[in-house]
């Protein structure tokens, strides 16, 4: 029987590392707030068209590196490979284009490439 392991390029963050990650995130949040930045959180899953339009249809990211699937209604969704496009979409969709100009974000991003 095949031994089930994490997917290549994906990493478990175990309790000892979670403490470090949390500390760094708290430091980032505190520092960003002092300079007027506001946190934003976007979905991990986005309409694939968002990345095709913003990153470019012929780029390696779109053609080779995104984790994409099509649902039963033929909608194409991708796990976010980067954060800029999702943040821009959220600000526009949320009607915040005239009220917010300094944001920060953190979170997982997904690309099918060799782990570093």
Where do the language-model regions lie?
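TRNA-recognition modules of translation machinery and tRNA-sensing kinases, especially anticodon-binding
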Residues: 1-116
């Amino acid at each position: 029987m095949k031994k089930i392991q994490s997917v290549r390029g994906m990493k478990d963050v175990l309790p000892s590392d979670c403490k470090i990650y949390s500390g760094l995130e708290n430091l980032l949040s505190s520092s960003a707030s002092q300079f007027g930045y506001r946190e934003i959180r976007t979905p991990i899953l986005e309409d694939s068209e968002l990345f095709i339009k913003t990153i470019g249809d012929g780029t390696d990211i779109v053609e080779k590196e995104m984790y994409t699937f099509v649902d039963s209604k033929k909608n194409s969704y991708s796990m976010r490979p980067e954060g800029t496009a999702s943040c821009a979409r959220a600000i526009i969709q949320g009607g915040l284009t005239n009220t917010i100009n300094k944001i920060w974000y953190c979170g997982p991003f997904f690309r099918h490439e060799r782990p570093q």
